[in-house]
Design a protein with these regions (language model features):
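Post-transcriptional modification and biogenesis factors for structured RNAs
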Residues: 1-164
Length: 164
């Protein structure tokens, strides 16, 4: 199982796209306030398409409430500042992936507290960061790959005319 935690997300389209990733993978989505948008915002809904009924979404007033209700077992924080790459992580069991807001990332106190559980996605040095929804999808699918894509459809059914 994968849990995705967004701490103070600001851009509704990103949260909607991440919700769609959650819908397609069975991951749970945790949103930590303050949010930079209203959860009913049309941009959020549009980005998630008609998949919202498939999303297990939970909302928290602050980071402290999130930790009080969920703890920190299997928690991994994402930051461009981490020395460790996500490819070096063992996510073969349940995992919680925490992402910060688009403009500033996760608060420094969180990164310091969980320094040994911070990971990054490799990229060129000239770039500041990946899009939040892309980063969430990359790490979610890596965790699911390590978990053997448990619970996901593992076959396709292309018709002859589709492959031509």
């Amino acid at each position: 199982m994968v849990d995705i935690v967004l701490v103070e997300p600001e851009i509704p389209n990103n949260t909607g796209a991440i919700a769609r990733t959650c819908a397609c993978t069975g991951a749970r989505l945790h949103l930590v306030k303050p949010l930079g948008f209203d959860i009913s915002d049309s941009a959020v809904k549009r980005a998630g398409l008609d998949y919202w009924y498939l999303v297990d979404i939970r909302v928290y007033d602050n980071v402290e409430q999130y930790f009080k209700m969920n703890g920190d077992a299997n928690l991994w924080l994402t930051t461009t500042k981490a020395p460790k790459s996500y490819v070096d992580c063992d996510w073969s069991g349940d995992v919680t992936l925490m992402f910060g807001k688009e403009t500033a990332g996760l608060p420094e106190w969180l990164r310091e507290k969980y320094r040994d559980r911070c990971v990054r996605i490799p990229m060129i040095s000239e770039a500041r960061s990946l899009n939040l929804s892309n980063a969430a999808a990359i790490l979610t699918y890596e965790a699911l790959r390590q978990q053997g894509f448990k619970g996901l459809k593992d076959y396709g059914n292309m018709k002859q005319e589709e492959s031509e």
